Amino acid sequence: MEEFQRYFELNRYQQHNFLYPLIFQEYIAALAHDHGLNRSILLENTGYGNKFSLLSVKRLITQMYQQNHLIISANDSSQNQFFGHNKNLYSQMISEGFAVIVEIPFSLRLRSSLEGKEIVKSQNLQSIHSIFPFLEDKFLHLNYVLDILIPYPIHLEILVQTLRHWVKDASSLHLLRFFLHEYRNWNSLITPKKTSSSFSKRNQRLFFFLYNSHVCEYESIFIFILSQSSHLRSTSSGALLERIYFYGKIEHSVEVFAKDFPSILCLLKDPFIHYLRYQGKSILASKGTPLLMNKWKYYLVNSWQCHFYVWSQSRRIYINQLSNHFLDFLGYLSSVRLNPSMVRSQMLENSFLIDNAIKKFETIVPIIPLIGSLAKAKFCNVLGHPISKPVWADLSDSDIIDRFGRICRNLSHYHSGSSKKKSLYRIKYILRLSCARTLARKHKSTVRAFLKMKRVGSELLEKFFTEEEQVFSLTFPRVSSTSTSRGLYRRRIWYLDIICINDLANHE
């Protein structure tokens, strides 16, 4: 119990008293304006150690500004909203600048938590594909899964309370309240099916940071219970646990929680349990019984409502059996299927037939939502029939082919982990024919006549069929034989360099 209480001690020495003056510096506005900022820069600045003072934050921001050479050219003024007359311009710049500032201490803590760990390349943990090998390895031995829709706070002030115990600058907190009340429908960021305003689209960085910080508050205690009740230990989860910090609102819940911890641990004892979170959903998979999963379900609901001021209902958590359920997340439909097989056993004069079912983890590309995304982007109709892209007809032939080829390669790269490539081949066919029809529309010809053109037709085929195989051969240079290469190409391949979901792949 002493170890448990020490685990929940607050880190009050890491308090930044005056962040407000930094927001209005010129280099902050430049950093906030650069939407292509490489966040790995925050982890590559090694000269500051564990110093979380205002001066170190300011030096880091200055260094980031100098490294990226974010000089706004006057030539871009006609095309860039930075110089436009938008009523939300200044609130956008300031909110993005605020997000840049508050992200730096968290990035420094992440780097310090990874030091000394057996993680060679921590950036691989940031890849979206890194979760699928974990599922493939672990879910074969599990039976049930909880599909959880993460609740959102009942009041915007709760998001401010998340930061107020390490940011003592009242001006910054008042400014944060201004952003939150200007955008009242902030929870539509977490539930993408709802409509969102233009302000939300320009300030997603700040809102996602606040939302993740708030989720980590109550998620931390939950993960701690999992680590104590399970026999499993993971280096990656250990590193993630150390980057979580607990604030004032948890003090009361910790006091109550510490008294009931032995009974809770006994109630929810499960030697094999796994947890993962993505966007506004999370998954809790277990080898236990439906009764145990119901206990977890009602414990989560009561914990959210009683201790963290988060409104939730039991109907937002679904209990499903892995063998009869598809996990719909991150652009894939994942499931655990039983492959039946029959073995004949011969003993002396008698023979027996033995049924042997083998579990197999499958990941499938959901073709219908993906075709819907292509139809929304005007590459095909709702039935999946390719159509031309009129808005690109004014571009050069090479630019049109490059754009279609880039989309096709990105989708193939992201969905390379699919167990069945048939759906992916159909998507490539739609894009290829849409490209041909766009070029034929530009040249006022038919698709058949256009494809007979030797130069353009061969270039089109080369873009869509040979370039992907060239990238594959560069990824696996030791694969020499053609048959071996084709067999490996048909298998699931997970890449550890994918840190964002393609817009066409994100159909949730």
From Swiss-Prot:
Please list the GO biological process terms of this entry: mRNA processing; RNA splicing; tRNA processing
Q: Does the keyword RNA-binding apply?
A: yes
The entry lists its GO molecular-function terms as: RNA binding
Q: Where in the cell is it found?
A: Plastid, Chloroplast
What Pfam families does the database record attribute to this sequence?
Answer: Intron_maturas2, MatK_N
Q: Which family does it belong to?
A: Belongs to the intron maturase 2 family. MatK subfamily.
PANTHER family for this protein: MATURASE K
What this chain does, per the record?
Answer: Usually encoded in the trnK tRNA gene intron. Probably assists in splicing its own and other chloroplast group II introns.
Name-wise, this protein is Maturase K
Origin organism is Huidobria chilensis (Loasa chilensis)
What taxonomic classification does the UniProt entry list for its organism? Answer: Eukaryota, Viridiplantae, Streptophyta, Embryophyta, Tracheophyta
